[in-house]
């Protein structure tokens, strides 16, 4: 996917001050309920979950549900399983078309975390802000829908329905569904001591989009202008937007090639939160230890200049449509990282070995002084495509 021109509201006959991100007070997957609160809220759903499964198919086929990236439900016939996920987010970038692509990629990412590469069907869930003027609604929402549709088509699937409602905030999400044979998905519970942890997208998207908005807020920009330039911020923002819109489909396919033992995608709970959640699901007594944090260039410095208000160094900074965190056999991990960069997968993208799986008590932690890997922006060397539907 090529870099796009910056979204210009006036090209769509909108006021130049229009910002999509102003139609929600929370950003991206920063809307997630905290993990500990979520677990308490879902306790009543979990009580009878596995009892029903045992009555249905016993332990013949794997089942996954409450609290994980997707649900895996054994079907009554044919040895098949239904794999399904739903997700939604609030606007995190001001380009409506890219926001649609990001929302779609974010939904699909939960399937990809299971090693599923084919999605049979998608539904789109839209909340149209009742604070939008008629003109804003009629110009912006079709761009969002087109972005969502284009990302679905890139994933080899289609949008066949959904639900659209009025809401105080703009809400973007969907449902992704597929029917799989057991060898088409990878249960996220087989990590063993000696595995390594691989991450397929850099961290820091939430920081990048936040500081990009600070360019228009002098009192906030003044706090960080000594550690980052406006050009640095623009590049980080473009890189974050492209990363969020990029599908994790290639990584999902390579999970099979290189014998992945478990995976999750990194979104609203931050890398540590999702690593902890994945560690809890393991059948073996293991723990995850993270030594390296790949971060969008200059965003670690920005985070430190802000007193680490984003939680980036602690692993609690939310990501939107982040990468996959994959447990791979040590001997396979370097080959995975080399393969995902191959031009045969389009532009080719980096992945990083960030930690290890060791014998433990199903916890995850980041070491006291993790190595920060500054990830240079790829967008600087790419062609710029015009925004679709804009008038000159």
From Swiss-Prot:
Top EC category: transferase
Residues with site note (Important for catalytic activity): 32
Active site: 31
Origin: domain of life: Eukaryota
Cofactor info, note text: Binds 1 Mg(2+) ion per monomer.
A Gene Ontology molecular function term of the record: protein homodimerization activity
Cell location: Cell membrane; Nucleus membrane
Signal peptide: none
Family: Belongs to the selenophosphate synthase 1 family. Class II subfamily.
Subunit structure: Homodimer.
Stated role: Synthesizes selenophosphate from selenide and ATP.
Name of the molecule in the record: Selenide, water dikinase 1
Organism phylogeny: Eukaryota, Metazoa, Chordata, Craniata, Vertebrata
